[in-house]
Amino acid sequence: VDLVCIAGDLFDNDYNAIKDPDEVADILSGIKSRYGTYACWGNHDVSEKILAGFTFPQKETIVRDGRFTEFLHHAGITMLEDETVCIDNAFYLVGRRDKDMAKNEQLLRKTFSEITEPLDPSLPIIVMDHQPGELSEASDAGVDLDLSGHTHDGQMFPATLWSIFSGKTPAEF
């Protein structure tokens, strides 16, 4: 394996739902790849009330449990938040800050142009962006490949119905 990319939602809103975090982190740290294991945050990588896959509005500010970050460090996973790494002087890997969580945490999310402007355009640019909503902007900014998650391939009800009745494939969302 050359590179492992995890496009968000490593956690399901509750750190305590991990039965044995140390054991799971040890297992993940066993992933061997030539260039490393990288991730970006997803919209479920925060402490938030959830039931049957749906979150509920909260009055308090939604925050990321600090144990998530400690877990990733223990697991040997490098988190990229609107950050870029040049890998082996051969290509760039960009990890985006999740758009929903950036709003909740009152953080700025860079534009694709801001991210790619300082990069050497002769090298390929691979982006991990949990929510695949800005593909045209990514393409216009020189992104060659966008790796996303979030859609669950339309496998969660009622998203299955949306896919059926809209005539769109899950990738089109």
Give the predicted meaning of each segment.
Residues 1-173:
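Soluble catalytic domains of enzymes that build or remodel membrane lipids, polysaccharides, and related
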